[in-house]
């Protein structure tokens, strides 16, 4: 008899629509294969839904704040029901770009230089700081956000205006801009699944390039790179997965410039939409969408 799966999707983050799509795609595939499914929001009805449905596994399809930052994971561990993806600590670390980058640096994983900018401690010498430590252009991004939400490439001319528009975040990361190729690597368990290159039509692989079917981002698999370099970037992704203590699947985002890889961030709950990269990499490796989902479910546990 097939298991009963409760799928958590939606939420209140800016990635709500992506989460709903991920939940829908996973539910659709599982239903086709005979599983009993219930989709639930992470709201006040969650406990009621869990008690009434009595799921064998909870599939966490949430993205963004409260979904992949350790918050919901802490709640799920109290139910003593196996759930998918990374646990509270790994999720909170990966979601915090400042902490995760410091861990990368401490473990000799190459990552772009950065400074943290707090709006309650505004620096009159910000331009000097950037010129001294980073150089323009720079990338400005929220410290705790995913899917390239509110990520901007800034010049000396527009950075003040961009920062003004982001004051609701309280603090942001200002990172050196790395030109070059976009390489994404998927890890499955503690094994290297594969890599894919992205060629967006715009300057970088932003939210629109990721989820808009009209954005015409080119996906290249296999990556056109030497075997040694491919192994190098996949080893970096696996190392990042391990030092952050990720569980299940993860996806690491890299830039490749002047023969060097730069790890931008690691994603503990990569999307499962029709445009998502982990299912695409898995399919290239001969793992169907349902087999990928079933592996994630089998990997679930009560303590992550």
Q: What feature does the model see in each segment?
A:
Residues 2-9, 93-181:
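Active-site nucleotide/adenylate-binding loops and adjacent lid/helix of ATP-dependent enzymes
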Residues 176, 185-187, 241-274, 282:
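Conserved metal-phosphate-binding beta-hairpin within the catalytic cores
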Residues 197-250, 280-304:
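Active-site "cap" helix and flanking loop/linker of ATP-utilizing ligase/carboxylase catalytic domains
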């Amino acid at each position: 008899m097939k298991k009963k799966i409760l799928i958590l999707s939606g939420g209140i983050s800016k990635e709500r629509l992506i989460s709903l799509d991920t939940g829908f795609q996973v539910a659709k595939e599982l239903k086709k294969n005979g599983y009993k499914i219930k989709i639930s929001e992470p709201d006040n009805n969650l406990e009621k839904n869990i008690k009434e449905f009595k799921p064998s596994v909870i599939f966490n399809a949430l993205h963004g704040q409260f979904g992949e930052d350790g918050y919901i994971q802490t709640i799920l561990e109290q139910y003593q029901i196996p759930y998918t993806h990374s646990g509270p600590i790994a999720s909170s670390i990966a979601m915090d770009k400042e902490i995760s980058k410091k861990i990368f640096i401490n473990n000799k994983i190459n990552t772009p230089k950065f400074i943290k900018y707090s709006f309650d401690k505004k620096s009159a010498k910000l331009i000097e700081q950037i010129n001294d430590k980073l150089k323009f252009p720079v990338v400005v991004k929220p410290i705790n956000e995913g899917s390239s939400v509110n990520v901007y490439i800034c010049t000396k001319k527009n950075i003040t205006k961009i920062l003004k528009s982001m004051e609701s975040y309280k603090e942001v990361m200002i990172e050196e801009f790395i030109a070059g190729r976009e390489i994404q690597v998927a890890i499955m368990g503690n094994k290297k699944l594969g890599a894919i290159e992205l060629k967006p039509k715009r300057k970088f692989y932003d939210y629109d390039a990721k989820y808009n079917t009209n954005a015409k981002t080119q996906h290249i698999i296999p990556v056109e790179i030497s075997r040694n370099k491919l192994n190098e970037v996949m080893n970096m992704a696996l190392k990042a997965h391990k030092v952050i203590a990720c569980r299940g699947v993860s996806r690491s985002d890299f830039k490749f410039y002047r023969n060097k890889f730069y790890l931008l961030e690691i994603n503990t709950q990569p999307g499962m939409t029709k445009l998502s990269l982990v299912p695409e990499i898995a399919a290239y490796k001969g793992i169907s969408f349902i087999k990928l989902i079933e592996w994630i479910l089998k990997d679930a546990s009560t303590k992550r």
